[in-house]
């Protein structure tokens, strides 16, 4: 039995737009509850997830692999508990005229697994809606908001 969280979605868009949705702070802000992902996205670089351009950091990590627009692998931890570090892989591929996005969040503690299993579906559904329609889901309005449980993807 694995403790990995695996989420696959198909999005009517391009790999470049999915890559930008994940890595461009202003793009991410549109669908990720006004939060941004900040980094230069080069292997070995640090990244941070923040609602206010890095002043209030919610998640941190390092870029382990970066192959735009196909694959991004990062470590993922709360700045308050760096020892509870996990790993997220984003694999982006064209399939039958649409993008298949596979997100695998691995090396999860029980606490982290609980939070991200609620957060990732909200965030990724919002990204899909935003890329396909131009309108994101208000993930902060969903019962408790995306950031209400420790370790969630927001």
Annotate each predicted stretch with a short phrase.
Residues 1, 41, 53-57, 80-84, ...:
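A generic structural micro-feature
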Residues 6-7, 13, 17, 26-58, ...:
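Short beta-edge strand/loop motif at the mouth of beta-sheet-based domains
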Residues 9, 60-65, 86-93:
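Hydrophobic/aromatic beta-strand elements that line small-molecule binding cavities or substrate pockets
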Residues 15-16, 64-70, 91-100:
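A short, structured loop/turn motif at beta-sheet edges
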Residues 18-19, 28, 47, 63, ...:
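Hydrophobic pocket/interface hotspot
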Residues 21-22, 31, 66:
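Conserved catalytic core of Hanks-type protein kinase domains
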Residues 50-52, 59-66, 73-80:
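Helix-adjacent hinge/juxtasegments
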Residues 75-122, 127-129, 139-140:
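Beta-strand/loop substructures that line and gate deep hydrophobic ligand-binding cavities in soluble
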């Amino acid at each position: 039995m694995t403790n990995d969280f695996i989420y696959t979605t198909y999005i009517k868009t391009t790999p470049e737009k999915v890559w930008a949705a994940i890595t461009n702070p202003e793009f991410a802000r549109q669908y990720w509850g006004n939060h941004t992902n900040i980094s230069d996205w080069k292997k070995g670089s640090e990244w941070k997830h923040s609602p206010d351009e890095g002043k209030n950091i919610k998640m941190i990590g390092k870029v382990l692999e970066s192959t735009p627009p196909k694959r991004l692998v990062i470590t993922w931890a709360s700045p308050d508990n760096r020892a509870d570090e996990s790993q997220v892989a984003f694999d982006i591929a064209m399939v039958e005229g649409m993008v298949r996005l596979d997100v695998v969040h691995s090396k999860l503690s029980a606490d982290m697994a609980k939070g991200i299993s609620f957060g990732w579906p909200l965030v990724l559904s919002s990204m899909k809606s935003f890329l396909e329609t131009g309108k994101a889901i208000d993930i902060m309005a969903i019962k408790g908001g995306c950031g209400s449980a420790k370790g969630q993807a927001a």
